[in-house]
């Protein structure tokens, strides 16, 4: 495994344990390397976090591609694409991202940009479902706005934690709510 990849993976683990409060000293200690070595790959903690976001969305994209090219039904594909998150991100308490925009504004912008992009495969699935008469016609812009707002809300409040839900459980519940508004017959 490359040093850069080890830094990313350890950052994910530290974030899982401490949220945004982990330090580069802790990261270096966990990796058994010097901070200077980390700085050879990343100029700052914010740069590392940006790469963690990029890495996560690359993994999400790979999962989505596998789902979209599978033999699943259109309904099942849409359900799975909407909740696609990398395995190593499943245990993360995403409420730890609350306040991200104040501390690491560039990372927050990057995360938001990813939430707002690459909706074409989802739109195509919904349109396919409409053509197959398993989904009722819906305004795709409103669907995107609803889902994006929910994703952002999940990440920006402590409501999931206080209700005992993980991010993945909340996504699954959101998908159930959305799908029962779309599905004609299952």
What are these model-predicted stretches?
Residues 6, 10, 14-47, 51:
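Helix-turn-helix
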Residues 51, 65-91, 144-147:
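Hydrophobic alpha-helical connector segments
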Residues 54-61:
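Short, basic, alpha-helical segments at the C-terminal edge of helix-turn-helix-like DNA-binding modules
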Residues 67, 96-102, 154, 158-161:
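Secondary-structure edge/capping motif, primarily at the C-terminal ends of alpha-helices
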Residues 75-76, 113-116, 130-148, 165-169, ...:
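All-alpha amphipathic helical-bundle segments outside canonical DNA-binding/catalytic cores
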Residues 84-88, 92, 132, 150-157, ...:
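Phosphate/oxyanion-binding loops and surfaces in catalytic or ligand/nucleic-acid-binding neighborhoods
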Residues 86-124, 131-134:
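Short secondary-structure transition hinges
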Residues 124-128, 132, 161-186:
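C-terminal peripheral helix-coil segments that are non-catalytic and often amphipathic
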């Amino acid at each position: 495994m490359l040093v850069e990849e080890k830094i990313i993976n350890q950052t994910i683990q530290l974030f899982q344990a401490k949220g945004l409060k982990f330090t580069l000293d802790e990261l270096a200690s966990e990796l058994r390397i010097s901070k200077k070595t980390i700085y050879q790959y990343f100029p700052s903690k914010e740069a590392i976090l940006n790469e963690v976001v990029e890495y996560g969305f690359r993994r999400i994209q790979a999962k989505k591609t596998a789902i979209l090219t599978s033999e699943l039904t259109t309904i099942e594909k849409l359900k799975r694409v909407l909740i696609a998150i990398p395995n190593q991100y499943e245990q993360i308490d995403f409420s730890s991202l609350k306040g991200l925009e104040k501390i690491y504004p560039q990372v927050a912008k990057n995360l938001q940009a990813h939430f707002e992009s690459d909706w074409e495969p989802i739109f195509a699935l919904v349109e396919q479902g409409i053509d197959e008469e398993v989904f009722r016609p819906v305004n795709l812009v409103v669907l995107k706005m609803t889902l994006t707002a929910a994703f952002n809300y999940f990440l920006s409040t402590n409501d999931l934690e206080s209700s005992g839900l993980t991010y993945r459980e909340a996504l699954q519940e959101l998908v159930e709510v959305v799908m029962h508004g779309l599905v004609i017959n299952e």
